[in-house]
């Protein structure tokens, strides 16, 4: 049940004339079982016999109080509870004019008017198993507003038969948001907007549209002579918020009631404009949210971007200038000239938080100047005209502008309260920066936010991610316009376009840039493709947050693993910082893999850089199922034709190898086929294979119909093979690899090293190799997609002595023996939560042996391992 559903249901109970079932109905709202409530009403579960009182074990002790005697009633039941050593969670008394309640666990009290009870629905959330502290952390008051606002949106869409996105409705909602905020923050007179609707419109909502149309005209009028008397108290707003004519809408009793409740039940002064993004998420369709990237980003996460990008430096400048009024004045001038640009601004979260931080810095500078000089005349420095953005979605674009106006008003109030004799009027509104409604990939950023090389400009944001497989036709067209001539450019995520344009913009304007991104731009196959292009613009990475979980406070938020990458023009004077969790490390250079090291890029290769045998795909049947047998089919076949046993081999693919299971295949050459071709089963199965190949539209497959008794590929081992799954879960510490004998044929869904030395399996199952795979492998969803070109052929291995190889071989054989002893599938054995401790220890022993081949000093982290591997890769590829 949504939050506002709880509130609304309690409002229904409170507004009834008959309150004889008040407690039972209240308990029902919080999902106390109906059977329990029925027995309670009958007295079966009421643990007290006192008249007018109800005691439900562990839940509540309730008492109806005499008029005006709430405290006496509460003291009375408190004494009863203490005397009986009872443990009800809540004590609750009411005379139906007021409500007094106490939470016996937290000792928190509630003392409100009876009609106000719905607003405090969260007080009794423990009945639903939700602690209030937890609730307040997860569901701020802003979300309550978002849900209530979303309900208005849904009802109006239904009442007006609106299916597609509608500009008129969207604009109406933006204006409605402003009016709610204005009446609670003294831009309008208190409650004037809601009272206007309550007193001058019919209950059925029939004349509500006309009222809104008239009001919006007045709010856009500077001349007030012909304004109707009942609207004269509403001021001229400007900012073009009300300039566009109001679109006629149908209203009903229901939508009118929801609008009034939105004004009466919410204190809009407490609602942060940066949460308006969550309102957009609440009203926008799931599809729009996913594709257009209308992210609501929490303040702590925004600070991770803007602090290292510019805010830390500005704060340090303030401290450095603290006792020097000339330096303070220079800093004041400087912060009034900086430009801030979010080219995927959504509903404006990053711009709003940045604006507020700059205004607070302005306030602190003015206060300090007044302390130093006695008097200091306030002249506005930071203005909305310094803020720029691009947003593709109309609705979010309009909310971004509205949110900036609201943020401006809030900061004007803060200024008035903090600085003596400083006043900055909100109305009439001024242009809210330059927020363009456009596709950021199709416009020149220098046209949106023009800047000379000498100007201070910061670009930041949380652009849409969208992997290549999730991109629609428009997205693919956008990407083609940028990366069409780049080899493998089609593999890049959509966010790569923002990195490209950010680098291009920085190269011509000297801007500093920072984006939140999925970690695809810093690990895996996309790294070399993207950063080869970015480095052409002469940029460097200035700071970065390595992978962390990014969540927001918006409704039903989903966490994703992201990185933050800050970059700008080449500058040896810039201190470069790597952030890992809560630690901050000063480094000489940050590579595209977010390591402390040179800008090395790992590209796919056709041959191994180390002295390694070739990694093959397994064997593709391309047989229409004719040559493959399930265990049951195989058993039936050899029971009926025992003479066929020598012509079968085990057949394993990636799924069977990791999760267990087995199939069989007919493994024939021409000579073997000639011996058994008259067998009815063989004839049937070969016929299936031949028909499949003949009907194929692929000419190569058609040729295979000439030899329908054999696989397309016919690799086999004389001894044993190293088996490498092509896909493995990202959650595993190691990719489960192993050995297969000559009696097993491996499918094309698995990689194979035929007749390899066993020590090589130890190398490939080491943490060093796993670190490499994490950094350079492609992804299938979030799982690692192993490949010969990127993972195996590029893996740098130092020269190994015979002794080292023998040590590695002994360690991997010990692991194989342990796996045999433990039993179970590889998926079970390598599940990180259930991996046997003996197996973990054996792997750690192997890791140590392999790592000492790279250096004698013990590695402290995977970051260190990757730094060493990248350096060795560079050395080996430059030889």
Swiss-Prot record:
**Catalysed reactions, semicolon-separated:** a 2'-deoxyadenosine in DNA + S-adenosyl-L-methionine = an N(6)-methyl-2'-deoxyadenosine in DNA + S-adenosyl-L-homocysteine + H(+)
BP GO terms, sorted = methylation
Q: Does the keyword Methyltransferase apply?
A: yes
Q: Which UniProt keywords apply?
A: DNA-binding, Methyltransferase, Transcription, Transcription regulation, Transferase
KO phenotype (gene knockout): Decreased promoter activity for promoters with the target sequence very close to the -35 SigA-binding box (scpA, hbs, rnhC, yumC and zapA).
Q: Which SUPFAM superfamilies match?
A: S-adenosyl-L-methionine-dependent methyltransferases (SSF53335)
The similarity annotation says: Belongs to the methyltransferase superfamily.
GO MF annotations, alphabetized:
DNA binding; site-specific DNA-methyltransferase (adenine-specific) activity
Q: What is this protein called?
A: DNA methyltransferase A
Answer whether the UniProt record assigns the keyword Methyltransferase to this protein.
Answer: yes
Write down the EC number: 2.1.1.72
Question: What does this protein do, in the record's words?
Answer: One studied mechanism is via transcriptional repressor ScoC (also called hpr) which binds to non-methylated scpA promoter; when the m6A target is methylated ScoC no longer binds and scpA transcription is up-regulated. Other mechanisms for gene expression regulation probably exist. Binds DNA with and without the target sequence.
Miscellaneous comment as given in the Swiss-Prot or TrEMBL entry: The sites are enriched on the left chromosomal arm.
**What Pfam family does this protein match (any one)?**
MmeI_Mtase
